[in-house]
From Swiss-Prot:
This is Uncharacterized serpin-like protein R700. The record marks 363-364 as: Reactive bond. Disulfide bonds: none annotated. PANTHER family: GH10112P-RELATED, SERINE PROTEASE INHIBITOR, SERPIN. It comes from the Viruses. Belongs to the serpin family. Keywords: Protease inhibitor, Serine protease inhibitor. Coiled coil: none annotated. May act as an inhibitor for a host chymotrypsin-like protease.
Amino acid sequence: MDYSHKYIKYKKKYLSLRNKLDRENTPVIISRIEDNFSIDDKITQSNNNFTNNVFYNFDTSANIFSPMSLTFSLALLQLAAGSETDKSLTKFLGYKYSLDDINYLFNIMNSSIMKLSNLLVVNNKYSINQEYRSMLNGIAVIVQDDFITNKKLISQKVNEFVESETNAMIKNVINDSDIDNKSVFIMVNTIYFKANWKHKFPVDNTTKMRFHRTQEDVVDMMYQVNSFNYYENKALQLIELPYNDEDYVMGIILPKVYNTDNVDYTINNVPMFSPAEINEFINNCQYSKVELYVPKFTQRKRYEFVPILKKMGLTHLFNKNDTDLNIMAKDAYISRIIHEAVVVIDEIGTEAAATTIVIGQAMATRPVKQKIKVFKADHAFIYYIRHQPTGLFLFFGDYQG
C-alpha cells in the first residue's frame, strides 16, 4: 500500500474544508456562526467543569493543557460508544455530545486564528464501523494501515500530521514503540491558535524583573498602560486581554497573597476556584485603565492522561474486559491517552497548540471612570484562553515563573 499517497490524498480532502484560510494568507472565517449565536449551556458548563476538575487533579505545578482538545477527543469516542461506555462518558463529561454538537464545535473552532484537526488511523485487520466513518466525514482524516509491518511509517505520519497542524509547535509526539500488536486504532486531535493582541506591548518596555516564588527568579516582564476588562476583590485580581479577533481573550487570575505556606492554596500555589466563581469574576469585570505587567514566557507540558482520568472517576473506557467502543467491527478499549500542550506569550500576541493522542487496543460591561489599577503578575497565577461567545476554555494553565 502506498500509505504516503493515501495519507496525502485524505489530508488534502480534509484541508480543503479550510482552503480559504491559506489562500494568499487572506484571513477568512469558515463557518463562523455570528448571527443568532446559540450553544447549549450544558456544553459550556460541561467544558468549564471538566477544565476545573482536570486542573485540580494534577499532581504537579506549572501545568498547561487544552480542555477543548481533550473534550473533543472524548466526544468523538462517545459517538462510537455502546450503551455502558456511553453512560460512563455522559456521566463523566456531564453531557451527551451528539453529532450535531460536534459539527457545531468543529465549525466555530475553525476560524482565521484557530484550527482544530482530527486524524483516525485504523488497523487494516479490522473493518471500520461504516456508521462511525460516515459521522466523521468532513471532521477527520481516516486511513487504514498494517499496524504490524508499518509501525514506523504510521508513527512518522502521525507525527507529520501533528507537526503540520500545530505549525511545528509540537513534534515527535509518538514513536513506533507506542504501537504494538494489540493496537487497533490511533485517534489524533490537534488544536492550534495564533493571534495578536489588540493592545500590543511595546518591546522597549520589556525589562528584567523579579518573579516571586519559593526561590526568587528573574523574568522578562512586559509592560503597558491601557484599558481592559478588570475585576478585583480582597483575594485576587482578574484581567482579560483581548486579541484582534475579540471573540478570543486571554485571562489572568492573580492572587493577592502568594505565600506558599498559605493553607488556602493547592499544590499549584494558586487558589481553588469553581467554574461558577470564575464566571462570576468575569461577569463582574469593568472596563478600567490598568498599569499592566505580564511575563513573557513559553510553557510546555506532556501528560499520560489515563491515570488522571481514572483519578477523576472515568474507568469504564479503560476496562479491557468490558468497554464497548464500536469504532471497528471489533470492540476496543483505550490503553493510552497522550496529551501535550504549549503556549508562547510575547509582546505581539499568543501562539498555542495542543494534541491529544488516543490509542485503542482490541479486547481480550459599560466603561466607567476609575483611577488606574496596577496589575503586576510577578508571582504564580492562573491563565486561560477563552472563546467569548460560547464561554469555552481552549487552554488553561498556571504559570510559576
